[in-house]
């Protein structure tokens, strides 16, 4: 079944996303957590026991790894705060993962652009060669 079939799970995921986003911006003081950290998506299991939080960090690979490490170390505090603010029997265990889909998208765009430019250059060169060959025949 799709996630749309479970509106309670979706509502809980959105609420967790809002709470943790606010905490990252205002409450967490861990210097390892980059200021430019965004929550991309939160997936909560149907039994509401686990929540996977996908984050994006603006920075180099070291900053990304440090941010994930800082969030993992702070997960107990974050979970306690989430549990205080949501109305659920259980507070899901929080699993932080780095979402690299944006970087992959940029990389794929660059690859496609390079291939397209190469094709255009080759077509231009072949057209010029054909034109010069036609002039020589005249």
UniProtKB/Swiss-Prot annotation:
Residues covered by region (Disordered): 119-138
Cellular localisation: Cytoplasm
GO biological process: maturation of SSU-rRNA
Alphabetical UniProt keywords: Cytoplasm, Ribosome biogenesis
Broad class of the protein's primary localization: cytoplasm
Keyword Metal-binding: no
Keyword Transferase part of the UniProt annotation: no
Molecular-function GO terms, alphabetical: ribosomal small subunit binding
Record SUPFAM superfamilies: Ribosome-binding factor A, RbfA
An example Gene Ontology CC term for this record: cytosol
Record-linked NCBIfam families: rbfA
Subunit: Monomer. Binds 30S ribosomal subunits, but not 50S ribosomal subunits or 70S ribosomes.
Function per UniProt: One of several proteins that assist in the late maturation steps of the functional core of the 30S ribosomal subunit. Associates with free 30S ribosomal subunits (but not with 30S subunits that are part of 70S ribosomes or polysomes). Required for efficient processing of 16S rRNA. May interact with the 5'-terminal helix region of 16S rRNA.
Family: Belongs to the RbfA family.
Protein name (database record): Ribosome-binding factor A
Organism: Alkaliphilus metalliredigens (strain QYMF)
Primary gene name: rbfA
